[in-house]
């Protein structure tokens, strides 16, 4: 009985032990699963962190790497007239440029400062003085860049340029030689990204071809023949309403043009080998101011003769830039000097009002005298700078790489943005108001378009910007649903630039003065401007030019020339 009792008790104990073991194993298994799940979850989080960290690292060190989270940067925006010609409803923070950058890089500009083009530089002076800089901004003065570097206000961009700029962007900068990037290096450090000032070529003479046809005039082959055409416009009162005096060749009182202005008389100065308002190499190899030379004196005498003949607008001294533009757009003027892009501004507006107006460009290279070597400077270039301490200085390089390389040469999804070229949307619509391109980009684009039109090149080989212009030019040639933008694209790219390509024009080699101290003091600038206008209008004899030169040196010019010669040695 005892044994039987023990056996029963043993069986119970055995069952209890088995059950306990089973429960223990079950508990251990559950614990192991929970531990594994926790470990897997931890590993997943760590993996996500590593992935996210890797994404940030890729974004910081590559041109096209996309940020895992939106990076917002504050910006000082230079806004253009008429909302930069942006399509209705688009803004400087929400347009095709900003949306594409958001999609491609996951970045967004926040325009904390906005100012018009004509007041932007003055505004920049204020915020720099007050040390109220946005993360990114464009400045338009080399002296301002010098000041910002001296006061340690901006970031060193050397490393981010190396890693976050594409090879093509670097090649674009290289097409200008080493001087351009060297101009923004301080103690070997790259402190800004300069605009590449593309060669816009010489000024062309734009004439109303429909007026010439109406008067039975032949197209001019020389500058003097062109002035005969303008004289005929005057005698036949072309563009003048009853009681109004006809308008001759309109020109701005500054007389000398820039890469962004029309209405100069540069070709007339070039006819005499003169380089007013430019520093040039003198006969003895020293730097001289071009406005003081005998060649400039001869050109002024010729301008006076044109004024006396009524060819030059008799009221040119009273007109402002806006007034000159109004004369062209209103159809009162039939002649002025302007660069190849003139159809975009102001001629496009006149064509929209009067589609029968027919402007043609003329170029007379045979009449350009061999001039002395002139010096270029970087004083008026635009520069992109980054605020000292901003954590994403690479963002500037990435924007340049996307806008001026990827979307123009590789992207298959940037059509809407690239239509901006044909729509003549102003560059101020871009977050960074500079352009980066090859030195001879203007001529390369036209040569490629002409090859496709002639059937010597496939359209697929065109870059995005070239394709946009080609399609507009093709629309104009075919005459189907032609828009004013199509007309402007054809007149600028084919008629104007095509004229330069045909004449085998080549970008002249530039010699740079490595100094930013070239600004003419206001007193000397005013003396020069008043003297030149008075001589042209006949209020002073041409002999007064020699007296002007003496006064220029006496009133501070002598010290200025000495200083510049010292800097250039």
Where are the predicted features?
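Conserved small-residue motifs centered on glycine
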Residues: 58, 398, 405-530, 539
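Long, His/Glu/Asp-enriched segments that create or flank divalent metal/ion-associated functional microenvironments
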Residues: 99-102, 339, 474, 480
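Short, solvent-exposed loop/beta-turn-alpha elements that line the ligand-binding surface or hinge
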Residues: 65, 156-175, 218, 276-294, ...
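Carboxylate/His-rich catalytic cores and anion/metal-binding grooves
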Residues: 142-179, 229-234, 244-278, 334-348
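Extracytoplasmic/periplasmic substrate-binding proteins
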Residues: 254-278, 304-464
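Conserved N-terminal structural module of periplasmic/extracytoplasmic solute-binding proteins
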Residues: 3, 28-226, 287-289, 411, ...
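Helix-loop-helix "hinge/cap" segment bordering the ligand-binding cleft or interdomain interface
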Residues: 158, 185-260, 281-327, 332, ...
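Sec-dependent N-terminal signal peptides of Gram-positive bacterial secreted proteins and lipoproteins
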Residues: 7-31
